[in-house]
Amino acid sequence: MTGDWMSKITHSGLKSWIEEVIALVSPKDVRLCDGSEAEYQQLCQQMQEAGVMTLLNPELHPNCFLVRSSPDDVARVEQFTFICTKTKEEAGPTNNWRDPQEMRAELHELFQGCMQGRTLYIVPFCMGPLHSPFSLVGIEITDSPYVVCSMKIMTRMGASVLEMLGSSGTFYKCLHSVGKPLAPGEKDVAWPCNPGHMRIVHFQDDSSVMSFGSGYGGNALLGKKCVALRLASYLGHKQGWLAEHMLVIGVTNPEGRKKYFAAAFPSACGKTNLAMLMPKLPGWKVECIGDDIAWIRPGDDGRLYAVNPEFGFFGVAIGTSEKTNPNALATCHSDSIFTNVALTSDGDVWWEGKTATPPQGMIDWKGRNWTPGGEPAAHPNARFTAPLDHCPSLDPQWDSPQGVPLEAIIFGGRRTETIPLVYESLSWEHGVMMGAGMSSTTTAAIAGELGKLRHDPFAMLPFCGYNMAAYFEHWLSFAGKGLQLPRIFSVNWFRKDENGQFIWPGFSENLRVLEWIFRRTDGEDSIARRTPIGYLPTEEGLNTTGLNLSRDALQSLLAVDTQGWRAEVNNIREYCSIFGSDMPRQILEELSRIENELK
């Protein structure tokens, strides 16, 4: 097997990099992945035999598997995620920076011999539609068959990508290891990892990623957050486009007119639910381009076009149910991998929120018999990895090489007070300030940070690959290019009343907010009123027919809380101070304008 890959790779730069890596990590075997279904099944079979994967009941979930990770490798690890640029200033105050030379030396030591006793897999992948001029090719070298199978679902992967790369194409070097070499005769564990030495490192000078010690999704599937956001955002800054942590949907009204919207929410704030929304209002349709990442570029006609670079969903399982997201359950019905969920006695999967009553006789995510009233059966960051084309509401343009034209950009977060249900920016600059000022209650997708309110500008705090002040400036620069820019909105489904209950019903009823946004992009002025914080819906402008929502509740959702907003402005201004003199003045001017108008 070791020599087979040589004849199939015509790219001399790729060949020499692979040889370098093999010499460094000393694998027992080398395998070039072709992305075929036969290869996927063989690797899944191999993982079943090793006790890594459990085949689910094929009558309930055809061709689906359950994987349990180590309890200390369950989420992205921001404290061990580094951006290596020439200077610390280029990475900015929100990123962990290390000197590239020092970090390379440290990683060289960690990777030395780290694949002993393991197979090295070469995984060619493409972020974006094959043969789109905007797509990026990466090669991930990994010692994890779980990563190989997940990359087959999450990216366009295999022989077709090598063919596309040819003998001289540009590619991103992505090196990953679980960091647990095996001595001769040593028995492997089900989920090898090395929590004491985790490193997820991005080198912007040569567009490469090195990840060590973790097998978890965001740390190990290097095409996702690493290439498609952290490296791509840096590239976009240089080339005049945006790589964003955004869902993209097509919304069609009862007259048959369709518009595309992009929306940025922090992890576990409902991106996947909105991306797969099933409207209750008659005649409306919502279709999904993607639920997590959007690459946005100016088109020849002056509009901004969005592409989803991914090929699958890596969705949060907790809370996903027939009520909250039936399309997600349909998407992961077959050909999917579930990680850290519970296993039922009949070979099905379960997680908190899937049904009102937990089934009897389950095995929890740690592999133990589960008893009600104890620890959760599924980990809070349990995931499903499912193919994009299994989504029942997939948009026909999902694979378009040019992308889809955006008419609205939406920012949202999990805020229990102050922030209204929906409002629209007064200008592009004001909209950029709205994105820069985003904050949200944190979730289980980030290790060790559950339940705190934190600033998360554009939902990109963990994913922006350069100085965020320069990133804000980059967003602002689109106003000076003569483009037909989308309108910008803010939404907040998570307002609570004095009893701690959510005021807005959410989920499929969020279509009512999308309807207001749709009508605003049509230029309907009568449905909005201008306030210091932006255009808010009039009470009659928001369609609440058939909702059990009192007038008082509606008014509180659409009110400008003067005191709360003064505190919000101060809070955003204080946060902006970490960027010092790099902070764009337009954002500070917008904050001052709001403050003055609130008086």
Curated annotation (Swiss-Prot):
Cofactor(s) the record lists: Mn(2+)
Metabolic or biological pathway: Carbohydrate biosynthesis; gluconeogenesis
Location of this chain's protein in the cell: Cytoplasm
Residues the entry annotates as binding Mn(2+): K225, H245, D292
Entry superkingdom: Bacteria
Cofactor remark: Binds 1 Mn(2+) ion per subunit.
GO CC annotation: cytosol
Location, primary (coarse class): cytoplasm
Span of the signal peptide: none
Gene3D superfamilies: 3.90.228.20, Phosphoenolpyruvate Carboxykinase, domain 1, Phosphoenolpyruvate Carboxykinase, domain 2
Enzyme's top EC category: lyase
Pfam family, one: PEPCK_N
Quaternary structure note: Monomer.
Classification via NCBIfam families: PRK04210.1
Family to which the UniProt record says this protein belongs: Belongs to the phosphoenolpyruvate carboxykinase [GTP] family.
Protein's name in the database: Phosphoenolpyruvate carboxykinase [GTP]
Organism whose genome encodes this protein: Chlamydia muridarum (strain MoPn / Nigg)
